[in-house]
Amino acid sequence: MTLTIDTSTPESRALLRPDPTVEKKPLIGLSREEMAQALASIGVPERQVNMRVRQLWHWLYVRGVSDFSRMFNISKELRAKLDEHFTIARPEIVEEQISQDGTRKWLLRFPPRGAGRPVEVETVYIPEEDRGTLCISSQVGCTLTCSFCHTGTQKMVRNLTAGEILDQLLIARDRLGDFPDADTPDGAIVPAEGRKITNIVMMGMGEPLYNFENVKQALLVASDGDGLSLSKRRITLSTSGVVPEIYRTGEEIGIMLAISLHAVRDELRNELVPINKKYPLKDLLDACRAYPGLSNARRITFEYVMLKGVNDSLDDARELVRLLKGIPAKINLIPFNPWPGSAYECSDWEQIEKFAELVNRAGYASPIRTPRGRDILAACGQLKSASERMKKTERLKLEAMMIAGHGD
């Protein structure tokens, strides 16, 4: 039986066009296996699939293209078919702010994916002479409500997909001229030589281990040697202490680990970092001691925000040293970054230095983090997107969808 398709009239031809209201499937963030399945689904011959995956991977993650028409070694016919079914477009940049110290913050807008309206996240680039660090978000909002953190005052909206996590890296490389044949913007502060983005830290909005599968997939793509090729030793994931997923992070991703510690006694940490009520200090530190590959060259970073009169006494410093005994560690002391409505103050500089000296004498590196991007609310603990303005009815609708298993 032969099927004949009528293309003689504009109306019949219109029926063959893709429905513009149907979202195209993003290719960014797919694993090689998923990309192969996607290509097979649109009729790419089986014998060609692996070759086409290699070509796409190179164009997306080595060359950094965001338009199928630029993939010159792929036939025009296949490029048209890819464009019909898939998207590799970058998210919208709503705003770009540049701090006096060269720190850059981008507000990015992503599709609703069940949230009722588009959502926004913030991504921050911190340049130094010998490195450029990109701080990436994993969620829109956060569930943890840490009392000193601005992001924690924004209710959870949704998880980011693996592609949306990677999009933040791709956007930053676009804007900094970090792909081949691209130009660095005039006046941009970037490392003296080599890559503009040398390190990424999962320290933006959200708790990455509450979005484990998407974060895992994004970081495995980012560290793939045939693409973006970031060393796993230059990727750090920061968690407030989701203990079961700390074990999984070490086994399944193998990147560097940072712990948002901030207190040395359960009573205070319960207040500052409420997840401590579920995973107290002993359980958290046991997971740290078991993290694979620990050595003096591969240490866990413990982040400790300095809050005046709250957690900054020398007794706190001594207890910190005692708690971390036997863990190859570095302790980042973070001067508290103020934000509107916060109930805390930053410790006096003299007290921070005394705290650091005591910890350092015990054998732990204890750098005091230089505040970056404070003037554009891009510093640690200051990120909060405009998605917080989502109407209550829209948020409740999203929460119902997530409970039902339809949200991302």
From Swiss-Prot:
Cellular localisation: Cytoplasm
UniProt KW keywords: 4Fe-4S, Cytoplasm, Disulfide bond, Iron, Iron-sulfur, Metal-binding, Methyltransferase, rRNA processing, S-adenosyl-L-methionine, Transferase, tRNA processing
Cofactor(s) required for function per UniProt: [4Fe-4S] cluster
UniProt key word NAD: no
Catalytic residues as annotated in Swiss-Prot or TrEMBL: 122 (proton acceptor), 380 (s-methylcysteine intermediate)
EC number: 2.1.1.192
Reactions catalysed: adenosine(2503) in 23S rRNA + 2 reduced [2Fe-2S]-[ferredoxin] + 2 S-adenosyl-L-methionine = 2-methyladenosine(2503) in 23S rRNA + 5'-deoxyadenosine + L-methionine + 2 oxidized [2Fe-2S]-[ferredoxin] + S-adenosyl-L-homocysteine; adenosine(37) in tRNA + 2 reduced [2Fe-2S]-[ferredoxin] + 2 S-adenosyl-L-methionine = 2-methyladenosine(37) in tRNA + 5'-deoxyadenosine + L-methionine + 2 oxidized [2Fe-2S]-[ferredoxin] + S-adenosyl-L-homocysteine
A single cellular component GO annotation: cytoplasm
Major localisation: cytoplasm
Disulfide bond positions: 135-380
Top-level taxon: Bacteria
Family note: Belongs to the radical SAM superfamily. RlmN family.
Extra remark: Reaction proceeds by a ping-pong mechanism involving intermediate methylation of a conserved cysteine residue.
Cited function: Specifically methylates position 2 of adenine 2503 in 23S rRNA and position 2 of adenine 37 in tRNAs. m2A2503 modification seems to play a crucial role in the proofreading step occurring at the peptidyl transferase center and thus would serve to optimize ribosomal fidelity.
Name recorded for this polypeptide: Dual-specificity RNA methyltransferase RlmN
Source lineage: Bacteria, Pseudomonadati, Pseudomonadota, Alphaproteobacteria, Hyphomicrobiales
Gene encoding the protein: rlmN
